[in-house]
């Protein structure tokens, strides 16, 4: 359900509900993180997959894996703040890595993370990801709700 995925992503990243989770962007950005049109487009893309996690029939986690050349790309990683710290994130990440290997024979998984989110970067490092040294500007023109403008995106990668 496109709407449920979009709502979960918003809940995990922005607004008051996000602030209850162990990691979020609420202190950096306001406004929508994504929307139903973007989610629908990603679902329709043959080189994208959403991995979903439910508890008692309720969507509590999702992540996007995409084909990115010879690698996989991991993004839109979201766990309902009420369901965090239960190992669900580790399972979602592992499922995305498995999907990238199985569907596209990906040799590595990459992602970008806001450089100020040190707790999240450390979480990925504990799962075998390393900073590549590549940085890119944060797309502030696509995020008019930036509360500060002193951050960019750093790339992490892991061999599969």
Regions found by a protein language model. Give the residues of each.
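Conserved GNAT-fold acetyl-CoA-binding loop/helix
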Residues: 10-39
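C-terminal "cap" of GNAT-fold acetyltransferases
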Residues: 42, 107-122, 126-160
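Conserved acetyl-CoA pyrophosphate-binding loop and the N-cap/start of the following alpha-helix
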Residues: 53, 83, 87-95
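Active-site acidic-Proline motif in GNAT/NAT acetyltransferases
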Residues: 67, 80-82, 86, 115-116
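Conserved acyl-CoA
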Residues: 91-108, 130
């Amino acid at each position: 359900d496109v709407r449920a995925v979009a709502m979960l992503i918003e809940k995990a990243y922005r607004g008051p509900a996000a602030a209850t989770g162990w990691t979020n962007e609420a202190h950096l950005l306001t406004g929508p993180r994504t929307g139903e049109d973007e989610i629908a487009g990603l679902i329709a893309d043959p080189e994208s997959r959403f991995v979903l996690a439910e508890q008692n029939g309720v969507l509590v986690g999702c992540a996007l894996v995409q084909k990115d050349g010879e690698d996989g790309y991991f993004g839109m990683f979201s766990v309902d703040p009420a369901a965090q710290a239960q190992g669900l994130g580790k399972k979602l990440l592992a499922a995305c890595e498995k999907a990238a290997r199985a569907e596209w024979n990906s040799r590595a998984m990459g992602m970008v993370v806001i450089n100020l989110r040190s707790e999240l970067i450390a979480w990925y490092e504990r799962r075998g990801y390393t900073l590549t040294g590549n940085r890119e500007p944060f797309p502030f023109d696509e995020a008019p709700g930036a509360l500060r403008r002193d951050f960019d995106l750093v790339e992490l990668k892991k061999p599969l």
